Amino acid sequence: MRLSVRELVEFVLRDGDIDNRNADPERMAEGSRIHRRIQREQGDCYEAEVSLSLTVDYEGITYTVEGRADGILTTGEGVLVDEIKTTALPLEEIDGENRVHWGQVLCYAYMVARQRSLPRLEVQLTYCRRETGEIRRFVRPYAFEQLETFFQDLLFQYRMWAEMQEEWDGIRDASIRDLPFPFSSYRPGQRQLAAAVYRTVRDEGRLLCQAPTGIGKTISTLYPAVKALGEGYTEKLFYLTAKTITRQATMDACEKMAAQGLRLRTIVLTAKDKICFCRDADGNRNGECNPDGCPYAKGHFSRVNDALYDLLGRCDLYSRAAVEACAREHRVCPFELQLDATLWCDCIVGDYNYLFDPQVYLRRFFDIPQGAYTFLIDEAHNLGDRAREMYSASLSKSTAWAVKKALHKKEALTRALAALNKAFLALREGDTEERTVTREAAADTLLSPLNQVADETALWLKTHPGAPEEDAVLSLYFDVLRYLKVAELYDGHYRTLLTFAKGDITIRQFCVDPSALLSGCLSKGRSAVFFSATLTPLPYY
């Protein structure tokens, strides 16, 4: 069984509440820059970004655990393994007792100690506050025996899940070997399409396929991909489409194969806005993913593993209704439960954004360089336009200013918003006309005030739970985070659109050509099949 250090540690050690007020969401690119700065400051004795892998046999199961240590410091006094975390919180609020953070660095330390035959070493958690660059460190010494005991205890707690997965793999593969095509005969062209898909998965390639409506594209792509999975050519299927009705057709195809004896864990992912249990009087999601605003968030992580084990034992096909029923029984968040279930599913059915969108892609799968995944991309003619939207972002001066006015009193956030407003005004560069202008260069002058706004909104949300302005601040926060994320992608494939109208200024980072970004996402898997009834002109796609 292969898994990452982060996956193992978070799965075993997580507990407590979901709380989006305490989150440090989606500041990965900025966090990476801070990591690199801290690493450079440590000197020549500090090895940065050290890849680690350890294969061990534990109670009859072989585990390969992989990860990357932020830093290893080797001096005459010994070895220290460092884990760096960025935060928006004041450092005095960091108590150095985060179980998951310590769990990660202890795993890395054990792997290093084992590889280098070290009887003892030190482990360090380094916290850096983004806003100020201040650093706080926590250091603890460990003997090899202590590290080994900790690591083996993690595997002991994970054993039930590993045994379940090994048993399931055997059941699934046996059912696939005997699985016939679920219809009495192939339609014209269907066999050729299925054969091409199978070869593509087997050979780790990419296939662009135009097939007429009515040929049965769903089963013609899914069936051979399932066969290839049973033969070990891929480990997980992602069936991605822009339409809800197509996702239901995929589940129908899986049910058809299940009637022929297939055992395949398949889940259809539902957007958070649709599956969330917490609604206001008008039926809209209230957005309060925290223990004060949602009873399903309170204690979620302490109950979710029991809920997950229950869900996986109930059936093979996990619809929205199945996930919701289990989540209500165990009082956990249905959205997070379905995401956890994906780790144990063979086929994941969902929207394009779960692979391609820089804000909502499935990090548990696609933050690693490459997985043994196959992407089946339906209605592929829609992907180009959707990608341009996913890789673009807009902000308006009026939206940020409205939040500042709503807050009234002077505080750090209002000062940050005032600075952002000033940066917006500077974008006019003396232009007084009401019009839209296009520029090739990015508006880099906005980035510093936007980062400041992001940090201050994160702190404000933490310290003002339930405030009347909370929804407006949260909405602005996510808009700013998206803009900053897209800014990290900005290159020659982008243009900046500035619209000056009625005293307002709107800036849009528009992705003209998303092909390189799409290709980067596809590289996260081994094979991909694009299919549609309309893929002309072919050179364009």
What are these regions (language model features)?
Residues 1-78, 99:
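Metal-dependent nuclease catalytic cores that hydrolyze phosphodiester bonds in DNA/RNA
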Residues 54-148:
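Mg2+/Mn2+-dependent nuclease catalytic core
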Residues 167-210:
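Conserved pre-motif I regulatory segment
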Residues 173-176, 180, 233-348, 356, ...:
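A substrate-engagement module of RecA-like helicase motors
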Residues 198-199, 218-233, 252-257:
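Walker A/P-loop NTP-binding motif
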Residues 202-224:
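Walker A/P-loop
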Residues 221, 248, 252, 328-347, ...:
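Signature of the SF2 helicase/ATPase Hel1-core->accessory helical subdomain module
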Residues 323-348, 358-366, 459-541:
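A contiguous, basic/glycine-rich beta-loop/short-helix subdomain that forms a polymer-engagement track
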